[in-house]
C-alpha cells in the first residue's frame, strides 16, 4: 500500500499571504514543527512568504539585514524587491539592474519567485508589457494571478479572462482563482459586481477581515452605489492599517461621493504613497486647473 502523502506545511501560509493576512504568515512560520522535513524548495518558499510578508507590513530594513548575499535566488529576488520599494531613485535603478542580471542568468532566470518579483517591480514602473514578458509563461498560480492583474491594468479584460480560465481549469477553488475571478468581475461591471461581492463575502467567512478583503467588499458596494456601507468597511480597514494605500484611495473616492471632505485621506495618501496613481491623477488635475486659471487671468 502506498504511503500517506506528507502534509503540506505551507498551505495555510500561502492562503494567509494571498488574502493579506501577513501577521498570520509571520507567526505561522514559527508554528511549523521543527520535525517537519521541508525540501530545499519548500524552505525557500517558506522564507520568501515570510520576508514578503515583512515587506507588506513595512519592515523593509529587517528583510535587507537578514537576507545575505549568499541566499538562494528566490530570497535574493525578495531582497531586491525590498531595495526597490524602500530606496530612492538610485536604489530603484540598482535593484532593477541586478534583477535583470539574475533574469539573464540561464541557471536561475526561470525561477518563479524571481519572475514574480520582476513582474511586481515592472508593474510599479507601469511597464506592463515588460512585466508580462516575465510572468506570461506562468508556471505557478501566483504568476497566473499576476497575469490577470497586468492584463486588467492594460485594459485588456479579454486577455485577463483567458488567464482566469487557465486558473479555473487548474484549480477552480484556489484562493487566487477566486480573487482573480473577483478582480475580473469588478472590471466587467453590471451583474458581475454581485458575483464579485459574493466571492469577497465567502473569503471574509474563511479568513480574517484583512485590508484586501475589506477593500474588495467596499469596492463592490461602491459599484452598487452603497457608499455609506462601503465607508464603514473602509474605516474598519483603516483601523487595521492607517497607511494602506488602497484603503486611503478608496476612502477619497467614497468620501467625495458622500459629499464629505476627502482632503485628510488624500493628504495621508500623498505622505505615505506619493507615487500612487490617484495622487498623480489629482496632482495632474490641479496642475491643469492652475494652468487654465493662468491662461484666463
Curated annotation (Swiss-Prot):
It is a peripheral membrane protein. Keywords: Cytoplasm, Cytoplasmic vesicle, ER-Golgi transport, Golgi apparatus, Membrane, Protein transport, Transport. Transmembrane segments: none annotated. GO terms for biological process: endoplasmic reticulum to Golgi vesicle-mediated transport; intra-Golgi vesicle-mediated transport; protein transport; retrograde vesicle-mediated transport, Golgi to endoplasmic reticulum. One of its GO terms (molecular function) is structural molecule activity. Belongs to the COPE family. Oligomeric complex that consists of at least the alpha, beta, beta', gamma, delta, epsilon and zeta subunits. The coatomer is a cytosolic protein complex that binds to dilysine motifs and reversibly associates with Golgi non-clathrin-coated vesicles, which further mediate biosynthetic protein transport from the ER, via the Golgi up to the trans Golgi network. The coatomer complex is required for budding from Golgi membranes, and is essential for the retrograde Golgi-to-ER transport of dilysine-tagged proteins. This is Coatomer subunit epsilon-2. It comes from Oryza sativa subsp. japonica (Rice).
Amino acid at each position: 500500500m502506498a504511503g500517506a502523502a506528507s502534509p503540506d506545511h505551507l498551505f495555510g501560509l500561502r492562503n494567509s499571504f494571498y488574502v493579506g493576512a501577513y501577521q498570520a504568515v509571520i507567526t505561522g512560520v514559527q508554528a511549523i514543527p521543527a520535525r517537519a522535513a521541508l525540501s530545499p524548495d519548500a524552505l525557500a518558499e517558506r522564507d520568501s512568504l515570510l520576508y514578503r510578508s515583512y515587506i507588506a507590513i513595512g519592515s523593509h530594513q529587517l528583510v535587507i539585514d537578514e537576507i545575505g548575499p549568499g541566499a538562494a535566488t528566490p530570497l535574493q529576488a525578495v531582497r531586491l524587491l525590498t531595495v526597490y520599494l524602500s530606496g530612492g531613485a538610485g536604489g530603484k535603478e540598482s535593484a532593477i539592474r541586478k534583477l535583470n542580471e539574475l533574469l539573464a542568468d540561464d541557471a536561475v532566470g526561470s525561477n518563479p519567485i524571481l519572475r514574480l518579483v520582476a513582474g511586481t517591480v515592472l508593474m510599479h514602473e507601469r511597464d506592463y508589457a515588460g512585466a508580462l514578458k516575465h510572468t506570461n509563461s506562468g508556471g505557478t498560480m501566483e504568476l497566473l494571478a499576476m497575469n490577470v492583474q497586468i492584463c486588467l491594468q492594460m485594459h485588456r479584460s479579454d486577455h485577463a479572462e483567458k488567464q482566469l480560465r487557465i486558473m479555473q481549469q487548474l484549480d477552480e477553488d484556489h484562493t487566487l482563482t477566486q480573487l482573480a475571478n473577483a478582480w475580473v468581475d469588478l472590471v466587467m461591471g453590471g451583474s458581475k459586481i454581485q458575483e464579485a461581492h459574493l466571492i469577497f463575502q465567502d473569503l471574509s467567512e474563511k479568513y480574517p477581515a484583512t485590508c484586501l478583503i475589506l477593500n474588495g467588499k467596499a469596492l463592490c458596494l461602491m459599484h452598487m452605489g452603497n457608499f455609506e456601507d462601503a465607508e464603514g468597511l473602509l474605516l474598519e480597514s483603516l483601523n487595521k492599517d492607517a497607511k494602506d494605500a488602497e484603503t486611503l484611495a478608496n476612502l477619497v473616492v467614497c468620501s467625495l461621493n458622500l459629499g464629505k471632505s476627502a482632503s485628510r485621506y488624500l493628504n495621508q495618501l500623498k505622505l505615505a504613497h506619493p507615487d500612487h496613481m490617484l495622487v498623480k491623477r489629482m496632482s495632474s488635475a490641479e496642475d491643469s486647473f492652475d494652468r487654465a486659471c493662468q491662461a484666463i487671468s
